[in-house]
């Protein structure tokens, strides 16, 4: 997946000043985010660090959010006119949302002033009416409710106690849909399971990726549920990450909740289908647990359909 051309141009524009320094900062920022998960520390304090964050993380975050929303909107038929992006960073999630949904009002809230400043710069041409507000998820009350509340790569920065409070707070601010996205790691999946447990107790309805509201059949001590999107790298990303490949794979775990009941699917594909000679094998999460099924040419249209599906798709 490629990010929108206008975002690519804006990132290149803001990174054109002090080019070498920005590349160095992007490497520092990546290290900070890897090593400070769950410690609640401020990770971005300078404008150059915020720009470096936009270079190193925005394309992948945009693509992950876009993938999650595209999948979730297939099952959700309520109107979404207002959006609240919590821990918005430099606005990647908001850009993904507005490329999929015709919104009337979008509010981006975040703790780091420099991140908000860079986010405004990136959106000044295409989304000038987005509101940006200072907000600390641990300390502040959420400013207002929205039809869609989204938080991406945020709760992994909180302690366990703060995560529970944050999840409950975000659910209270949700009129319709709540999206929570985390890194596609064992730890990220455990955070998703925490959110799942907390909100099912509050009678939330799962839109995606789960096919049911029952107990998750995956043992987090042995495995984890994650998906990925292939992200086209920009020229400056290649320089910042010292990579030659024209792409990177962004792995993510997620869960999406609805205030209203959802027509859930029978099964969700957990891994990319294994296509063999005349057959295809798929690993599925169903209401009865994890299943592995094989479809052959004898299954005709179903066989043809499954061959075209990917992890996260419903069956």
How would you describe each model-predicted region?
Residues 79-89:
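Conserved class I S-adenosyl-L-methionine
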Residues 112:
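Conserved SAM/SAH-binding beta-strand->alpha-helix loop
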Residues 239-315:
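C-terminal lobe and adjacent flexible extensions of AdoMet/dcAdoMet transferase-like proteins
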């Amino acid at each position: 997946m490629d990010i929108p051309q206008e975002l690519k141009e804006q990132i290149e524009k803001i990174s054109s000043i002090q080019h070498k320094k920005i590349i160095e900062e992007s490497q520092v920022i990546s290290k900070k985010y890897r090593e400070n998960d769950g410690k609640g520390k401020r990770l971005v304090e300078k404008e150059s660090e915020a720009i470096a964050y936009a270079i190193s993380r925005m394309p992948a975050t945009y693509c992950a959010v876009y993938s999650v929303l595209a999948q979730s909107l297939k099952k959700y038929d309520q109107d979404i006119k207002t959006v609240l992006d919590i821990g918005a960073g430099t606005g990647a999630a908001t850009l993904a949302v507005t490329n999929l949904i015709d919104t009337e009002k979008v509010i981006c809230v975040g703790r780091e002033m420099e991140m908000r400043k860079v986010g405004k710069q990136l959106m000044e041409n295409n989304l000038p009416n987005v509101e940006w507000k200072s907000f600390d998820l641990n300390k502040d009350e959420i400013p207002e409710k929205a039809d869609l509340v989204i938080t991406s790569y945020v709760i992994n920065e909180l302690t366990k106690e703060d995560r529970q409070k944050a999840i409950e707070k975000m659910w209270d601010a949700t009129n319709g849909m709540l999206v929570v996205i985390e890194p596609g790691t064992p730890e990220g999946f455990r955070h998703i399971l925490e959110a799942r447990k907390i909100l099912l107790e509050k009678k939330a309805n799962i839109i995606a990726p789960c096919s049911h509201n029952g107990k998750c059949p995956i043992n987090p001590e042995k495995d984890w549920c994650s998906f990925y999107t292939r992200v086209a790298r920009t020229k400056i990303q290649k320089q910042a990450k010292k990579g030659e490949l024209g792409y990177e794979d962004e792995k993510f775990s997620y869960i999406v909740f609805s205030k209203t009941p959802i027509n859930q699917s029978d099964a969700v594909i957990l891994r990319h289908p294994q296509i063999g000679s005349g057959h295809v094998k798929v690993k599925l999460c169903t209401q009865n647990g994890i299943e592995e099924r094989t479809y052959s040419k004898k299954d005709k249209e179903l066989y043809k359909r499954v061959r075209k599906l990917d992890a996260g798709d419903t069956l």
